[in-house]
Amino acid sequence: MEIIMGKTYRDIVTGFEGICTGVVEWMYCCQQYSLQPRSDVVSKKEKPSLFYAKQLELVDDGISDKVEAPTIAPPVFFGKECVDKVTGVHGMCVGRAISLFCCSQYILEIQPEDHDKWSRYEWLDEGRVVAAENPTREIDPQEVKGDRPGSGFPPEFALS
């Protein structure tokens, strides 16, 4: 099933309902959709949660009559060494977040020089990211694609 931002979906496992306001996709073929629940209390913002498309069923048109879903372009930077135009930081583009209401962000993984330390992740607005002119390393996303959706999804990126 194609998930369309702005529509309301229900998780078939938990019954959680919300409007799809974004998608996080990773280079290794994992996509999770962000559902923002409606609050019963005026001015209270509930926390969004992430779900896989196979977990979701369409409930209604949500706010799709008020907000047009963005056109999602191919992820041109996946697997490429990229540079943040603002800070000059280099990293491998491993994912992106696409929002219903604002610009997309690419996710760069910055590998520390000491490989015993954890990698750092930078979420950067798409306008800040450019491919490195002389990359030291690149990888075809097909080389790291998992057999099943969700392979390798880092738990620290969960929104709930």
List where the protein language model places each region.
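Basic/aromatic-rich interaction segments and small domains that mediate binding to polyanionic partners
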Residues: E2-I4, T8-Q55, I72, E81, ...
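Intrinsically disordered, low-complexity, charged/polar segments
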Residues: V41-I72, E113-S160
